[in-house]
Amino acid sequence: EQAPIGIHARFSHATEVAKAGYYAVTLEPYSIRVELTATDRVGVQRYTFQKDADSVCIILNLDKAMNWDRTINSDARASSPTQITGFRYSDGWARNQKVYFTTKLSRPAARIERTATPYILSKGQVGKAVGHGVILRLYYNKVRAGESITLCTALSGVSEAGALKNLQAEAPHTDFNRYRQAATTRWDKHLAQIRLSSDTPDSLQTTFYTALYRAQIC
């Protein structure tokens, strides 16, 4: 859907599942189950389609601005049938923040569409683009209920080559369940470093381990 906030989908909190190292929600009215997990440098997404569709689209939006953050330049391109490479430079939360990425797809898209919105630095440079906001649309045809597509996106603050190295080191496959289990195991190990006595009230245990979890992700 198109709205003032940009491309979006409705959801209900009733469909959410949130655990250490895992998040899931159903996008309505598309009936798409979204699941997220991660390694240290790789974000892993799985989209499961809950009904048949002639065509579905996964959108990589590098042109998106939210609150005080804005794109000042970006790029994204298919470096292979199952790999997307690019970068996003932004301003706002951090000045001239540079993030490079490589995304591995569990299956190639039938078609990829790329749009680039030019950015103009000032009124004195009308017509001179100093950067672009890029959006990639990945189209998949004849998707059946229960089918999934997994994306593994590695990040680097140094270069696209660095992002590729991180992907190769931490995401050699596209098995979402294996990444989720690994994340759960790591969180269990970290959170178990401090054990409360068995007579600690459940409410205090919840408060303590929630605070410990938040401290670990900072």
Question: What kind of feature is each model-predicted range?
Answer:
Residues 1-218:
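Beta-sandwich/jelly-roll carbohydrate-recognition scaffolds of carbohydrate-active enzymes
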